Structure formats: structure tokens, C-alpha cells
Amino acid sequence: ITVYRNGTSFALTLKRERITAPTVDSGIIEDTIGYIILSEFTPQTGNQLLEHVQKLMKQGIVGLIIDERNNSGGAVDGAMQSANIFLEEGKTLVTIQGKKGTMRDQRYISTGKAEVPANLPIVILTNTGSASSAEIFAAAMKDNGRATLIGTKTFGKGIVQDVFRFGSGFAQVTTAHYYTPNGENIHKLGIEPDILVEDVQLSDEEIPAFEQLMTDKVISTFVQENPEPSEANIRRFASLYTERGIDEEVLTLLVRNEYLSKMPYDKRPIADATFDKQLNRAVEFIRTGK
């Protein structure tokens, strides 16, 4: 390719390479609890997840939290391979039911031996941003009694769509639906959590106040003037600006996220339960079993 920069043009030769993007990250929180983020599902996610699980197990974890919040899905095979890590052989993972006359129903089952002891408690965090393959994984774990879901109901995207040539263009046609091991249709219904913990989010009434807060650069200015990301500073910011018409919990998350964005990536905590209600509830469940 030819690149034009600062008045000068020059040629570059680019070589394509296959890149395997990591979709799994992990760490230890609360001293003894394993925490895994699943950002999406690819064909490599199952292997990546297994490596992280094995690493955490060697550190003597007493429970595992898998965070699927805002995981929009991806490769269905990746979701099924991931569920295989935790389920014994012969468990239903998902069933695909086609429209009459389009395809035969297909049931997928777990294969091999579970890599994680059956007595290790597992929590999966979900919200409305958890969709498609993320829902397949969550449902397989929930319906087979291997994980407790905490958070809010998932998005509800569970269909198979095929693309056909149609005239001078193309048409996308739904040919099948995904069903959970318990026979529930995922599409437009989503997966209900076992324990409901609502997301902290802006209400419609708070949006104008939030926009003004950003326009005035209130958050970034506060962080610049108070660079220590301490709990005291975060709570002080929230208490100072509730008069702007934004809930204190929302303000807490906004300034915490600003502090995190200023940290070097390798210095950021894998998770912060201090101001995360859903994660806090997951930790409580791991500790108490209820």
C-alpha cells in the first residue's frame, strides 16, 4: 500500500497473519475466589478458558465467578466447549429446533470428563448485554445444576439465521431456534437469573444531568485534582454531586470508571467488588451458599 504522511508518500508491504485474540481473563479476588471474564466466544475460547481454570485451581480457590456481563455472544462451538469444562459426560448443552421441513432437530451433549470438581461453587454474572452464545453457556450451566446465575435477565437472542441470494441482493431467514436443556426457548425471552440483582444505570430523567456533568468535565477534573483512587475519594465525589440530580450509586461508578481508565492496563484490578453490587452478591453466595 502507499501511505501519504506529512506531505510525503511511501510504500509499505503488509503481510497478513492469523491473530488469536484473547477472550478470557482471570485473577483472584477476595483472597480465595477465582474470577474469570468471558468477553466473547470464539472457537479458541474453550481452550483459553480451560487454561485459566486450571491456573486458578492450582491456587486453591474456594469458588469461581464467571463474568458474562455484556458478552454479546460469538461462536456457538466456543460456548459448548466452555460448558464441557464443567459438565460430566452426557449432559444436554443446547437443542436446535428447526422450522418444520427445514432441518432436523439437533441435541448437543457434553463429552468427556469435567475438569472442575463438582463441589466447587460457581456463579455466572449476567445482564441484558449477555446474548446469544453467552446465553447458551449460561443456560447449559444453570439447567444442569452446575452454576448459579446472579444479575439480571439476559438479552434473549437464540436463533439460527441463513443468508440466501434473493434477486439482486440477499435475504436473511430464520431457520431454527435455540432451546435450553430444560426446553425453554431463548429467543426474545432470555435467561432469568437465580438471584436478581439489578444493574446500576442512568434513568431517563438523569440523562440530561449526566450530559451536563460530562460537558462541564466534572469527573475528569475531580480525578485530576484528586489522583488517588481511594474509596474515600470515590465516595466523596458521589456525595458532592448528588445535588446535580444523579443517584449516588451512579456517580460512584462513573468516577470509579474514570479512575480505572487513567491507570496503566497492567495496573488495573481484574475486578472491584467494592462498588459492584452484582459481584458483591456473587462473593456473598460463594462464601455462604445462599
Residues covered by each model-derived region:
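C-terminal "post-core" interaction segments
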Residues: 25-65, 70-290
